[in-house]
Amino acid sequence: MESKRKVVLVGAGFVGMSMAYSLLNQGGVEELVLIDVNKDKTIGEEMDLSDGLPYAPHKMKIKAGDYSECKDANIVVITAGLAQKPGQTRLELAVVNAKIMKEITQNVMANGFSGVFIIASNPVDLMSYVVAEVSGMPKSKVIGSGTVLDTARLRYLIAEYLQVSSKNVHAYMLGEHG
């Protein structure tokens, strides 16, 4: 694996593009590759994000790509999956999204990926398990976003109640996300 900091982001929806925007602004990535089943959307997102490159803290390359880009990636972030529909249980969503995770993971691994997976697709705990099982990677190389969002919400609510900055609230949510 090369020493450059390369992230492949699979899923160009709201969560994926929020992640991409954060990576652009934080400057920790040298190359960001976007993959999505909707190729036209991915190209459009690449163009939009690239417009912000002059304001990025470091030199960075953004491109729409395919799974062959995973070979030399340090991290593959998976945000792809269907959203939960009204009346649909998380277990029903898990069945649908597990199929998507399996296909994505097989495509990533078929291209020689040996880095770290970060999973942000719901239900995240189950999707992380699917990726770990399908990839055959050590479980230490498959990280689910877990309760990070729940923790942020908890800290925000406590801060609002106490009328302080959420930066000054140190609390953590434990358990399953959702």
Residue locations for each model-derived region?
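Conserved N-terminal Rossmann-fold NAD(P) cofactor-binding segment
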Residues: E31, V37-D72
